[in-house]
A protein has these predicted regions:
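Compositionally biased terminal segments of proteins
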Residues: 1-208
Length: 208
């Protein structure tokens, strides 16, 4: 259902791009399951047309769509078809983009790794969900060192600092690796990685 919806939504592409965990997993890392879709736009008029775009794409794939939440810059829908469902979040992005040019995979407009990792660092500061830590660990393992993206994250959110991120990383405690992870990771590996990174960031924050 996810793939059918995205394929039709971007058939005549509106000015939106896929970002977040699904974009990261489906198009870059293949590291975990992600059930929802995050579609962002920088265009206010396009955001206002969200109900039309959604209804058209859902109808063409034989799905129904129900509005779950509406806010000035956020809309959440549930798409259903034959027992399957997916949550789709539409966001009017107001934060400046580090890389305005996005990637295109099989016709689907996808956010860049630089944008996604910067947003993930911001997310750790604002909400600290385990999926964000998993994503950051797997990004680092794939060759994207987190410390290289802190400055980008700070451009998006002034509340991000090496000291704050170091503290949050040092506090991570896991009972188990979540079931949505599909690559081989152990709790020990995760905790060791974030403890080591926390120490590096602490030194960066308070050099002797």
């Amino acid at each position: 259902l996810q793939w059918d919806f995205l394929s039709d939504f971007f058939r005549v592409p509106p000015p939106f791009f896929l970002t977040g965990g699904t974009a990261l997993s489906a198009f870059y890392l293949q590291h975990r399951y992600s059930e929802d879709l995050d579609l962002f736009t920088l265009d206010s008029e396009a955001f206002n047309r969200t109900p039309m775009y959604l209804a058209d794409a859902a109808a063409k794939i034989g799905a129904s769509a129900v509005s779950l939440q509406t806010a000035p810059q956020f809309r959440r829908y549930k798409i259903e078809r034959r027992g399957e469902s997916v949550i789709v979040d539409f966001v009017r992005e107001v934060v400046p983009q580090i890389e305005e040019e996005k990637n295109i995979f099989e016709g689907i407009v996808v956010d860049t790794v630089t944008e996604i990792i910067s947003n993930k660092i911001c997310a750790v500061v604002s909400r600290a969900e385990i999926k964000d830590y998993i994503d950051l660990y797997c990004l680092n393992r794939a060759g994207y060192p987190l410390e290289n993206y802190l400055d980008f994250a700070q451009r998006k959110d002034a509340g991000v600092s090496p000291a704050m991120v170091a503290y949050l990383f040092s506090e991570i405690k896991l009972a188990k690796v979540p079931d949505f992870v599909i690559v081989s990771i152990t709790v020990a590996e995760l905790e060791e990685f974030f403890q080591t990174l926390a120490q590096k960031l602490a030194v960066r924050s308070f050099p002797s």
